[in-house]
């Protein structure tokens, strides 16, 4: 099978599992005991209007707050930085020489790495000016 990456935009607010149960957001037949009722999570509303509840840990791993332009810049900087670190490690490890055969593509990868670094610096400057 092939790999796919998907992203979706949602609305969410903090909510306990007990509150989610009271609002009918849990799976039918799922009744939390007193301990689980206190468990923190999020009330989630999808673009198609479907609403559900998600435990905090998987929600916070999958979603990042993107309410303001500053939030979105910080997400962009974090994502680009992650890709930059991987590319720089690939280039510096010598694996690039094993995988990429021609000098032109090696040069393009190095230019891409430099451009990503410059873009991260630009985003960081904009973020600092927005604080």
Task: Show the residue positions of the predicted features.
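Long amphipathic alpha-helical coiled-coil segments
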Residues: 125-131
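Acidic interhelical loop/turn segments
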Residues: 93-107
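Motif-centric detector for short Cys/His coordination patterns
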Residues: 1-91, 108, 114-115, 121-125
